[in-house]
């Protein structure tokens, strides 16, 4: 087993260790205090979308147990908490009246973090779009970007004086391709035009969110969390190398290019540009405002091969076989070196600010035995990937912090409650929390750290 103290010695004294969650995955209380349904509440209730028709009605009951959960973070010695805010609690219809009780909850949560000395890293959007906005087309409609701008301004005006950092969006890739092209996430669309519209409008909403945050809370560092894909070619053959570049443009460039270069990827636009929504003259300038930081979510490599099927849609790739035999319980390949290669590639291609690993973790479904959860494979996963982060720092990359996904087992989207990513086990019948062996190991690593000034430097 990797000794946490040995690993800790490889990180600079101002490196930040945190844990991450998301509103819909943990809060429950979906009808409490004026909250209205999100697209995920509706999606859970539609047959065939979520394992066992599980839903977020109770989840980890964090809405009622937040103090206990913050105490747990403090007891683990973890310095920072990355959480998301539920738009349907704060502006329940997406537009229209602000729900003070929703804001009050996050007031209590943020104040609770501050009282315990926990740094606050808030995410404005982690997929729980107010259902009412689907009446206008949801993210396929430009009006949703304007609704998000008002929501962002509302949140930052209320909480900005107590946040250590804010991200506009978590994983636009999921909210775009997984939700509008592959149909796996809410709203379950399978339509390229809808996906391209969602892509541009989410990118635009990100830009609006940056503007709104800087207008009302100029001291809070603003960033964006992206689940970049490694796009590793199956072979050195020309067809596979070209396929890997197309995959990179589609899965990464669709977001990185507009945000960090002020343009959409050329080959992608050549193939799909005539199906894009209207891109107004000022849009790319709004989208590409300089960020103070960015977050990378990484779990598993993407391996691709050329798909030579006649007429196949861009990016014309298909999955290539895994290289590692090690897989998590959700079936994802474990291959830490891809994280190093991915960060190298992204910093080669883009002028990026400092980086936080905002999610990294593994799904293993061990239960509690004699008051313990022996999840050695998860512990090994963390040790291996944190070793790569230390390598990246050694190699000169501006890695500033690491957030384990997740603090606790939770609602894992289309997989329901059957897949567990937590450092802490949750018994969903009793809501009892049990720190797993991986959580104890992570706690030993994080709590042994100096508690200096770990704020994000403003760009």
UniProtKB/Swiss-Prot annotation:
Enzyme Commission number, as recorded: 3.2.1.21
Signal peptide: none
Gene3D superfamilies: Glycosidases
Keyword set includes Hydrolase: yes
UniProt keyword annotations, A-Z: Carbohydrate metabolism, Cellulose degradation, Glycosidase, Hydrolase, Polysaccharide degradation
GO biological process: cellulose catabolic process
Single annotated GO MF: beta-glucosidase activity
Disulphide-bridged cysteine pairs: none
Residues forming the catalytic site: 171, 359
Entries under InterPro entries matching the protein: Glyco_hydro_1, Glyco_hydro_1_AS, Glyco_hydro_1_beta-glucosidase, Glyco_hydro_1_N_CS, Glycoside_hydrolase_SF
Catalytic reactions of this protein: Hydrolysis of terminal, non-reducing beta-D-glucosyl residues with release of beta-D-glucose
Entry's family note: Belongs to the glycosyl hydrolase 1 family.
Protein's name according to its UniProt entry: Beta-glucosidase
Lineage of producing organism: Bacteria, Pseudomonadati, Pseudomonadota, Alphaproteobacteria, Hyphomicrobiales
